[in-house]
């Protein structure tokens, strides 16, 4: 890909679960590849600001190239973690209109635009209203108390997404199912 003048980004998932030894190996392996940036993804959406900085500093310790962040919004911390990333030297932050993404969603474009007081906010709000609000209602992305619970327990959001979309269960079952997921995660 690089020989075809295609810029390559590598996304490392579930960064909240990676130990420093593995981070060092990943960075050492990728260093000679000349990728555009090494992206880290908070796949479980479980990183608070302090834990994000701890993980980010581990990557910065071993990676000399550009860094990027893909923040999930389970705990409603995608914006604050993204702002911390930029303040600590990350060059790349991604976002989606209305936080569009599987399950709890991602950093919302309109939040980052509003924070930086950019002129594009009216256009993004128009797109959101015209297209994305309807899509969000149909596909039901966005965080809720079950995604927040999963993030705190380090349960992958796919389990919650499956639970919420399974017609066999109703709201009265969700808490007991989420708690059983917690129990099965702690027995691993």
Regions found by a protein language model. Give the residues of each.
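Catalytic cores and adjacent flexible loops of soluble metabolic enzymes
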Residues: 1-188
């Amino acid at each position: 890909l690089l020989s075809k003048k295609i810029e390559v980004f590598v996304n490392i998932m579930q960064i909240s679960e990676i130990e420093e030894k593995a981070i060092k190996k990943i960075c050492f392996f990728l260093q000679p590849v000349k990728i555009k940036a090494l992206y880290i993804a908070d796949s479980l959406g479980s990183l608070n600001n302090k834990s994000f900085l701890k993980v980010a500093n581990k990557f910065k310790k071993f990676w000399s190239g550009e860094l990027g962040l893909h923040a999930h919004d389970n705990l409603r911390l995608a914006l604050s973690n993204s702002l911390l990333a930029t303040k600590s030297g990350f060059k790349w932050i991604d976002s989606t209109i209305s936080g569009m993404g599987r399950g709890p969603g991602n950093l919302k474009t309109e939040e980052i635009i509003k924070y930086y007081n950019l002129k594009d906010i009216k256009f993004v709000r128009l797109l959101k209203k015209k297209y994305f609000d309807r899509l969000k209602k149909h596909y039901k992305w966005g965080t809720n108390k079950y995604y927040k619970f999963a993030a705190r327990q380090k349960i992958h959001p796919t389990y919650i997404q499956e639970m919420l979309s399974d017609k066999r269960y109703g709201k009265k079952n969700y808490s007991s199912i989420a708690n059983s997921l917690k129990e099965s995660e702690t027995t691993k």
